[in-house]
Amino acid sequence: MAVGLLLLAAGVGSRLSSSLPKAFVSVGGLDLIQWCLKNLGQLRTALEVVVTVPKGFVELCERNVLQSLGTLEKIKIVTGGATRQDSVGLGIRYFSARITKLLVHDVARAFTPPEIYLSVIKQLETSKAVIPVIAIVDSIKKVNMQDAYREVARGPGEPFHTKSVLHLDRREFFSAQTPQGFDRALLEAAHERSVASNEQFADDSVMVAQIEKDITLINGHEASFKVTNPCDLQRAEFAASSLLSKSNVSPVNISQPPISALSMPLPLIGVGIDFHKFILDESPLFLACLEWKNYRRLQGHSDGDVVAHACTTALLSAANMGDIGSVFGVDLAATKDASGAYFLESTNRLLATNGFCVLNIAVQVISNTPRLADRRVEAEHAISDCLSGARISLSSVTTDGMGFLGRGEGIGAIAVAQIYHR
């Protein structure tokens, strides 16, 4: 039985609020796709692998694979489609003719344990379709589909207007996970049908079920959660830390003897310092990517966000790319009143283009006012959102009345950033 593995990494991660596609978001020093490859290391099973990535990210993915595997042999990295279903349809074309069974896996489920892959492969010996599922722990409520889309769009905490609610027994329902396994011929036939009917399905099991009702279910795993929203990154960080603490985790080996253990890349460290004085202006203060009403604005060609500027210089310094002034200029029309988020997001893209990823930034704010502790967590999240979910730590201190900062003439910030090169 010749098995192929299709890794879907073409999702843009819009709900993750990341400037990078989801597969290339850093968690614990590695991108999600690298964790996915790392977790496959214990399979010891010969697999032919195809990876679908967004347009323009083939080269970056190749670097990820080389760092994880040391080789591109048996790996094909191709550009995916506009939807998950399109990416699957494109990806299955790249497997060699000898492949008779296919596993389809979302890279967003980067921490799926090896035993789940092995269980799916084992069941494919006697089944045409195999789906890992996990019990639902929450109570289930059913509403009209159009009502659901409208109500969810209203945002967290907002009351539903619809009253058409059915209360379902959760014991009858399970959540589907990946990898999902299929006979190759069955999956290809299901895709041909979906193209002909112009239908879109939530996943491959739903699509295959249109022509094959006999689908085998196996128990999935809690670690096979899907990274979808920013809060999922905290869970992913915990999973990454757990894996790094295990000495028996080795890099993925698809068809060759084990290679040396994947080591964490050495961090590159940069320091950024910035100061701005207060001015009399009707505009509000901008600090740490937040607007602070009823506080004096900081002077600057841009919005004067001293925290964002210090972080930007720290990141550029770590990458040996200069500082905020040398990269963005000091008086360009394009950066007039530019926000701190603009500088951080632009720097994040610049780093990513050059193969860097942000690990974390620690920032010390020096000022008498405003009181940063009141909005510290909010500010950390705002900066993190600009940097693909990187960890941010903000703290503040005064000078006990000494110097121009002690006299309340302005605000200073010192930032230390850690990045790594893929």
From Swiss-Prot:
Segments traversing the membrane: none
Pathways involved: Isoprenoid biosynthesis; isopentenyl diphosphate biosynthesis via DXP pathway; isopentenyl diphosphate from 1-deoxy-D-xylulose 5-phosphate: step 2/6; Isoprenoid biosynthesis; isopentenyl diphosphate biosynthesis via DXP pathway; isopentenyl diphosphate from 1-deoxy-D-xylulose 5-phosphate: step 4/6
A matching Pfam family: IspD
UniProt keyword annotation of Repeat present: no
Chain intervals for the UniProt region annotation (2-C-methyl-D-erythritol 2,4-cyclodiphosphate synthase): 268-422
Annotated site residue numbers, Transition state stabilizer: R15, K22, H301, T398
Any GO MF annotation of the entry: metal ion binding
Binding site for a divalent metal cation: D274, H276, H309
The keyword Metal-binding belongs to this UniProt entry's keyword annotation: yes
Keyword entries, A-Z: Isoprene biosynthesis, Lyase, Metal-binding, Multifunctional enzyme, Nucleotidyltransferase, Transferase
E.C. designation(s): 2.7.7.60, 4.6.1.12
Protein name per the record: Bifunctional enzyme IspD/IspF
Gene: ispDF
